[in-house]
């Protein structure tokens, strides 16, 4: 049985496998132009959870073959930012192209933490990629925001979720070992709420609920999730 979550196993490595956000990654999308020219400005990805912000950032770095540093705004401080800046400067001795610095939940950085990024962004020490679920106009300081493009990511539509479901069932080696029949997708998509990661987590739960053939119906999905919530509540009671 696989220990890596389905969402991580299915994380796309190339833009052609990326699902959703056609306004950004379609044939005329700005991210296609990035790959054609190799010129990428610092930018912030703003959108709800599970719509592909982290994945898109990783694809950009991978397809342009540039170093990729990451920080989580939840656990990192000014010292961590300075350490990355020094690492990025050393990297420039070997590669004139600036590395990428990806900061997840950049809205969690306070003013002094965001200030510590300014000089490096301005000097091109690295290309900043921020990800946020909050409006950057309110959460990112003006000097930093003025140096970044902002790209809005939208919740996935049902057609996107359908493509993701089909990809999971045809590509994932663990799921291919199981007999799975999809009869209804209404509950699966409704509970996902346009969140790709949530869809794949629910699919993981539904498939893992039985050792036999999996028949996905609205009723079965609802029952599996109710049982999962009940089990979680019971465990919480035992540990509280």
Model-derived regions, located:
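Conserved AAA+ ATPase "SRH/arginine-finger" region at the nucleotide-binding site
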Residues: 72-74, 149-162
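Short regulatory helix/loop adjacent to the ATP-binding pocket of P-loop NTPases
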Residues: 118-119, 135-149, 166
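Walker A/P-loop
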Residues: 2-4, 33-72, 86-89, 118-123
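C-terminal engagement/docking regions of AAA+ P-loop ATPases
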Residues: 217-240
